[in-house]
Amino acid sequence: MSSYKINAIVLGGTNVKEKDRLLRVFSLEHGKLTLSLKGVRQEKSKLKIAKEIFCFGQFICEKGHEIDIVTGFDVIDNFSGLTKDIEKYYEGCAILDLLNAVASGANPPLFIEVISALKTLCYENLPKYYIIDKFLLSLIDALGYNFLTENCSTCQVRLTKRYLNLDIGEIVCPSCRNQNCVAISEACYSALKLLSSSSYEKLSTIKLGGDGEKEAYNILSKDFYYRTGHQVLSII
């Protein structure tokens, strides 16, 4: 059998047979894959750590008839801190669920984005919503929708008040809004701008106010649902 190595993060899995597990991973090289871990539910299995959600490392795999088989694993980071803090755990699960919803083939920028998000979530104590807001904003931007505009997408007038048109996923002015528009407050817009312009490593240096990050989470979650049909997991 031919073997290969991939760098991947575990999204989740399903127990099969008596001791095996099917693993869902997102890899740098090939995108989303399903892999088989043989005998991994045995107490002395050398691959036990590889079956855990959030685990990031290098998988050594062999080609199988239908599903490739993991034969070795070198952990890079298992982000264990996420499993010891319930709020971080919920936020981390929501991030991986979003990744699972949009990922398919190889996407190196998305891979780097999710590792950066989980690393910051695990090792920094940031206010709630900062990280998932930035991750959602990046996903929506990658889908081709821009929140950070100074002009109405319909009439091009300079914006003094902003509304998200959920029908088209674009920002409009008061004159162009309809019944399916959501108001974006100045605090929310300021939060979106700061989060977008800051790297994950620099999020600890910014301070948002007026509950802008919470409003941003609600608006981004609603917009993501309208754009993809996928409901963002609750982190409350």
What name fits each language-model region?
Residues 1-21, 26-236:
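Non-catalytic alpha-helical scaffolds and adjoining flexible linkers that form interface surfaces
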